[in-house]
């Protein structure tokens, strides 16, 4: 909704609310919304233009997510039935503010300032063994209560609460083809994790940590027309990060008595350089070619798991050098673009898993490490064809090959394992889609989209893979003067496809390692009505 407040002041309000029951039936709790998604978002923008040289934009956002978390089952069933005895939670509340000011000091000289602040509270909680004692007794003949009253509560609900405050400030100046700027970020995060009766992560019952991250960066960009058809653009960025981490936790000894674990502190500094140089050639008004060489980076950090060794806690920045070429063409009947790329990853970051205690599912944890070098290469193609004045066809194809060099990590306390020497995790080799869009003069429209994703490794620390799958989405609707009504179907073929996969021991009494799957949403049918006023 747009509202004019004063002569030079306008306000825009946006609000969104989404609800879904999460497509899970919890048999143990006899409820249908244990995995619900209830999300509300609002945004207010206030623009003020006192004169032709100064513009100010203030923004306020509010987001509240009251989501459940119940996505896993100890039988890996595809019927979306779960057996957890405790309610999971994946909630978030965020307040955010930003102020952007642009001042035209003189012709071809602009100064821009962007300030922002956000504060977020997050809660993540889940049932540690994913089921109640009745399930394990009936399905596996295993009854925790036979082991004594102190044993079963060990695998109770895990809960992690975070408070995150983030302040950023950016100032940049543009003078013709030159841009100079500076950037500052200060992130503070406090984590409180606890378990009602027992093991938390790797054997801790309570954890408390403070994470203080500061980033300071300067950047520059220069663009020049070498010829009327050939343009050169180059940019450079230098960034320095400072990380201070303090963590404390309480664990259990052999007699299940709480003991204080040794506190952990880190004070780390990292410096990183990024750059990009590109050439853009305009062949004619329909066709252009480009090529670029660039280096990007990903900041380092500290793992907060209390039972990791000191050597495994910090991880270094990753640097990636990219080479890319491509073309774009926009003709009357079609639009197409193609790009091919090759990337070298140095000191690459990988997410590995570790189960500190074979007989404790809550001791399964993820942490980030560095894996030496690796490569990424492939191509992407997108095309839109105007079949007729009412019908067009969209198609896309992606091909990706990756490689991670061999690396070592700790799979359990004192147990070193080897990973890598294969493709990277979460990197399907082939992806693609084909879609049709129809709309006539009377406002009737329809679309069909079929997408495909190839198999991929779930993690860098085990060799379990997903299955390839295809999804079909359909829409049918009609537009009126101010109203649009749409009937839609997502995952029309009701495909069961996995989105995440973990590999660890969960089932007593022997706790063999198994692949545990989480599935994407089933078929959904709905109606959407849009009204413009």
What residues fall within each predicted segment?
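Transmembrane beta-barrel wall of Gram-negative outer-membrane proteins
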Residues: 1-20, 24-67, 93-99, 165, ...
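Transmembrane beta-strands of outer-membrane beta-barrel pores
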Residues: 17-21, 62-66, 117-121, 184-188, ...
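Solvent-exposed loop segments that connect transmembrane elements
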Residues: 25-33, 70-85, 127-157, 194-206, ...
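Structural signature of Gram-negative outer-membrane beta-barrels, strongest in the C-terminal barrel
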Residues: 47-53, 61, 173-175, 183-185, ...
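Flexible loop and strand-edge segments within Gram-negative outer membrane beta-barrel domains
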Residues: 55-95, 122-124, 158-162, 187-199, ...
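Membrane-embedded beta-barrel scaffold of Gram-negative outer-membrane proteins
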Residues: 100-106, 110-128, 280-282, 288-298, ...
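Gram-negative outer-membrane beta-barrel transporters
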Residues: 225-232, 240, 342-344, 367-460, ...
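C-terminal beta-signal and adjacent terminal beta-strands/loops
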Residues: 346, 451-459, 478-533
């Amino acid at each position: 909704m747009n509202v004019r407040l004063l002569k030079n002041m306008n306000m825009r309000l946006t609000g969104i609310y989404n609800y879904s029951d999460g497509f899970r039936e919890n048999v143990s709790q006899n409820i249908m919304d244990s995995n619900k998604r209830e999300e509300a978002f609002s945004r207010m923008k206030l623009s003020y233009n006192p004169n032709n040289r100064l513009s100010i934009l203030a923004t306020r956002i509010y987001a509240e997510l009251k989501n459940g978390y119940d996505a896993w089952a100890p039988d890996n069933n595809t019927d979306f039935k779960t057996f957890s005895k405790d309610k999971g939670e994946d909630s978030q509340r965020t307040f955010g503010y930003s102020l952007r000011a642009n001042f035209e000091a003189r012709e071809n000289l602009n100064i821009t300032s962007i300030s922002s602040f956000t504060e977020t509270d997050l809660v993540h909680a889940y049932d540690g063994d994913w089921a109640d004692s009745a399930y394990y007794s009936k399905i596996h003949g295993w009854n925790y209560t036979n082991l004594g009253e102190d044993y079963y509560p060990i695998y109770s609900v895990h809960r992690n609460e975070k408070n995150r405050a983030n302040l950023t400030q950016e100032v940049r100046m543009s003078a013709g083809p030159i841009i100079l700027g500076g950037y500052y970020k200060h992130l503070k995060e406090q984590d409180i994790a606890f378990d009602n009766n027992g093991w938390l992560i790797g054997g801790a019952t309570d954890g408390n940590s403070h994470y203080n991250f500061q980033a300071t960066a300067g950047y520059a960009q220069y663009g020049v027309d070498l010829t009327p058809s050939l343009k050169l653009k180059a940019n450079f960025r230098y960034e320095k990060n400072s990380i201070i981490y303090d963590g404390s936790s309480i664990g259990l000894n052999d007699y299940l008595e709480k003991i204080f674990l040794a506190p952990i502190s880190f004070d780390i500094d990292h410096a990183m350089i990024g750059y990009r140089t590109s050439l853009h050639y305009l062949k004619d008004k329909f066709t252009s070619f480009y090529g670029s060489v660039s280096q990007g980076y990903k900041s380092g950090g500290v793992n907060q798991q209390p039972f990791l060794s000191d050597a495994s806690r910090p991880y270094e920045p990753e640097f990636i050098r990219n080479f890319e070429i491509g073309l774009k063409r926009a003709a009357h009947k079609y639009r197409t673009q193609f790009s091919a790329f090759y990337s070298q990853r140095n000191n690459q970051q990988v997410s590995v898993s570790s189960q500190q205690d074979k007989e404790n599912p809550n001791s399964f944890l993820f942490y980030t490490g560095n894996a030496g070098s690796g490569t990424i290469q492939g191509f992407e193609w997108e095309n839109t064809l105007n079949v007729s004045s009412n019908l067009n066809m969209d198609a896309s194809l992606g091909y990706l090959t990756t490689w991670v060099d061999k690396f070592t990590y700790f799979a359990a306390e004192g147990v070193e394992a080897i990973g890598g020497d294969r493709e990277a995790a979460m990197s399907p080799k082939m992806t693609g889609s084909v879609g049709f869009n129809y709309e006539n003069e009377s406002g009737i429209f329809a679309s069909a989209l079929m997408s495909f994703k190839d198999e991929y490794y779930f993690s860098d620390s085990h060799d379990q893979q997903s299955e390839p799958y295809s999804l079909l989405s359909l829409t049918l609707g009609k537009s009126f003067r101010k109203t649009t009504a749409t009937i839609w179907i997502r995952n029309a073929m009701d495909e069961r496809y996995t989105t995440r996969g973990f590999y660890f021991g969960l089932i007593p009494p022997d706790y063999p390692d198994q692949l545990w799957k989480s599935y994407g949403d089933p078929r959904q049918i709905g109606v959407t009505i849009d009204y413009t006023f």
